[in-house]
Amino acid sequence: MSKVKVAILGSGNIGTDLMMKLERSNILQLTAMIGIDPESDGLRRAKEKGYTVISTGIKGFLEQPELADIVFDATSAKAHIRHAKLLKEAGKTVLDLTPAAVGALVVPPVNLHKHLDEWNVNLITCGGQATIPIVHAINRVHPVGYAEIVATIASKSAGPGTRANIDEFTQTTARGIEKIGGAKKGKAIIILNPAEPPIMMRNTVYALVEEGKIDENAIVQSILEMVKTVQSYVPGYRIRTEPIMDGNKITVFLEVEGAGDYLPKYSGNLDIMTAAAVKVAEELAKHKLAAQTA
């Protein structure tokens, strides 16, 4: 089978975990890892594995644009705004793992099929990837007037990129809850928990559905079906208890355990982003290859 060439921009935690996940892909061929710190663990590992290593950032990649058709940006929201412009000019498809939200917001099981021709796809945030599918699952049965999510992650799993993007996290996640989840109003809260040993990523979804006849069984069934769908590409994603129904208020408790590729298993918040990124890139690649043979 033909493969589509991809490169990773950003050699931190997310970029390095992504590198390990891409090695298992049957349709994506990782060619290069791009960073700005030649001493970073990510670039060191990429060099050991035989990938092209660029330590001069995006400038270095643009000198060898033939290295990849799809570029994963695992840097920061502010950096992505600059990168997006340059990569668009170079004719690249971009998968944005920062909360910059320059391109189309995508949650794979909800709306990926609508955005297969986009040049820039944004994966929102870890909290968004974990909770928006649940908001959507409720909303497809009964309209959601308000949805609030609380994402609690281990302090140790929050690197400098995550910490620099807290404001963007809350804004972009809330936007995704509304635009993709379907809630009329959305709100997002992130909590960094310093507990030792580090906790798994936990997410709580609170949804207020509009007044009227509520089919509780249909809502619960829809949520459980969505959990199974997300598990197809994030095996450590699970619901901790049955959804709690209280009048028109629905509460769902979720947990995300990482695959333990590069990051510890408690870093489910980072793992769900890299797993979603690979899923999206594989579908974009299939679409590109199908268009070439059509």
From Swiss-Prot:
Gene Ontology terms for molecular function: acetaldehyde dehydrogenase (acetylating) activity; NAD binding
Q: Which InterPro entries match?
A: Acetaldehyde_dehydrogenase, Acetylaldehyde_DH_C, NAD(P)-bd_dom_sf, Semialdehyde_DH_NAD-bd
Identify the Pfam families for this entry. AcetDehyd-dimer, Semialdhyde_dh
Q: Catalyzes what? A: acetaldehyde + NAD(+) + CoA = acetyl-CoA + NADH + H(+)
According to its UniProt record, this protein's enzyme class is: oxidoreductase
Q: What is its EC number?
A: 1.2.1.10
Q: Active-site positions, per UniProt?
A: 126 (acyl-thioester intermediate)
Q: Where does NAD(+) bind?
A: 11-14, 157-165, 269
> Any idea what this protein is called?
Acetaldehyde dehydrogenase
Which organism is the protein's source? Geobacillus stearothermophilus (Bacillus stearothermophilus)
